[in-house]
């Protein structure tokens, strides 16, 4: 058999290559291997940090673009989500505020949804979603500074009908009164 005949047996035009399918397999394998080798806590920490780096980077980009360091919670949410339209389709369904926190109820269709949907060993709201948690919590921490003590994103449930995860974002207020800056005359 010559090389041409041999190559015909498995020839595949490059337009038929499915990179997302390969990514889904590698991503699922990575999550399972890290969990099996190092444990669940290490996996969650690693995935959070994978998201935190880009979260810090997008916050820095936003601050530079707006030439500001200070944003309100709802302003930061709107700016960040607008900047991330290529990766997320998020809709805010409810906003609640009390003395201690601001709570947003959201529908989130993210870039991880399709890979998770095709993997039997992955579920919505599972470990891989820590990438998003790290991303958003780090970005908001940078954009909101001292106004917020902590930001926490919680997966509530997967809504198959809406093809989105239902989540809440809690912004815990820093109720410590910040001293006004004084100027030396």
Which role does the model predict for each range below?
Residues 1-103, 108-130, 148-185:
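N-terminal accessory segment detector
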Residues 125-145:
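Active-site helix/loop of acyl-thioester processing domains in fatty-acid/polyketide metabolism
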